[in-house]
Amino acid sequence: MSVAQPPRPRSIAPALLLLALAAPALGASAPPASATPAATNAPFTDAQLEEARLLRERSLVDDTGYETLRSLTREVGPRSAGSPGDARAVAWALARLRALGLKNVHAEPVTVPHWIRGPCSVELTSPWPQPLAAVALGGSVATPEAGLEAEVVPVTNLDELARIDSSRIAGQIVFYTGRMQRAEDGSGYGRAVTVRGRGAAEAAKRGAIGVVIRSIGTDRNRLPHTGGMRTEPGDRQIPALAISNPDADLLEDQLASGQPVRLKMINSSSWADSARSANVIGEIPGRERPREVVVLGAHLDSWDLGQGAHDDGAGVAIMSAAAKLIGEARLKPRRTVRVVLFANEEFGLSGARTYARDHAAEAASHVMGMESDLGAYAPLGLHARVPADRLPAIRAMQSVLASIGVQYRGDDASGDADVGQLEALGVPVCDLDTDASEYFDWHHTANDTFDKVDPEMVRRNVACYAVLAWLAADYLPGFGRAPNGH
């Protein structure tokens, strides 16, 4: 997940419903095409809903998603844009989608930025010297080889920075103290992440020589969180590092003493030339309208500190497994289900923007888009952005997922960061909320590793996307164009 589009605040869902339906037999013959509608003017027939329920139950006992994630984290690991790990991830994804039975598997080239992390450090030099656990923010420039040392000016957020006279900032190191709040819907991220995105640029405008931020995360361990910064033409670039939450507490405690506090920061990160990566695509061809597609999206890149297990290895695995199970269903959907594993979400959405540009002429044939990029946690709610007369179909799709705990939450889907580039072209989208209470403990840290992922949560997510994609691809009228699409 990038700084480009943090999750929007959404309402808190009721407690997760218990799984209640026993799995029906999977070996029955395919339903006849003339099956009776479930109700007068119902969006789906009894046969379609039964197929979706069978797919749900099969997904809930299938570990393709979990084993796909194991393979990605074991055989590739970290895969930041432009790195050797990125190239390995593209090769891995091509092989994996083929092994899962997807068709038309191919790579579409994407040019990506290439930032290389180097060693860094932050040290309290007075009044009480101590080392602090730190990482460079993505895109940070280097310090001089000997580092930078200056007095610390604490500010809570960008609003407070704007109220401070520049004379207090000039020549100093700005420390952003704001703490991210834990929330089921992840809304604390959106409120906190602006200082990571624009904190260095705004401090530089006021003469700061460096920036340190409290990690954008909800944990209390000493592994700091990285993440991308957002620069604009004309911005003066200064070094920017994140320190862990306990180290930020220590720094605040020293500041509370009333004595001047000084920091020394060293960073040796650098930029290299742009690199070649790729969006990796595979399909389950539709039985009647193969040129019309439902997109299942996730981003293949990750940050370089951990394995990228939750962000977004889980999404890659979930969407790949959902497509594989759709391909094994008794009845293939009318339209094609297309998995798109996007390049470089973390450093500016290069893959999603390239896909939207290269496929703009086919936007009308994109029937629906969905994205998984909030880890593998309990699915809680469904949002959509479709014409009002198509909402009954969305609610019928949600009803198949009620036994997993998914409620319908609103008509305000965005497609999230990557698939949102398609929503801007008028492609209808669905968003699946998951419980984000723990996600930001690991997000963008060395702790984002395979052991943090619960196989049961992977299965539930696979079930949700398999059902949603199958029904969306088989829905005869289609979903038209997204309201307010361009």
Regions found by a protein language model. Give the residues of each.
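Bacterial N-terminal signal peptides
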Residues: A13-A25
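Noncatalytic luminal/extracellular "stalk/propeptide" segments of secretory-pathway proteins
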Residues: N41-F44, Q48, L54, R70, ...
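N-terminal capping segment at the start of a domain
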Residues: A42-S83, L223-G228, D301, M368, ...
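Soluble metallo-hydrolase cores and metallopeptidase-like ectodomains found primarily
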Residues: L49-E51, S126-V135, G139-S166, M229-A309, ...
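Second-shell loop/turn segments in exported
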Residues: A52-L60, R74-P84, G139, A150-V155, ...
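Short helix-loop-beta-strand segments that form the rim/entrance of peptidase-like active sites
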Residues: E67, L325-S350
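Metal-dependent peptidase/peptidase-like ectodomains
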Residues: P129-Q130, E145, I238-I243, A248-D249, ...
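His/Asp/Glu-rich mid-to-C-terminal helical/loop segments that flank catalytic regions of hydrolases
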Residues: K324, E328, R335, F440-H486
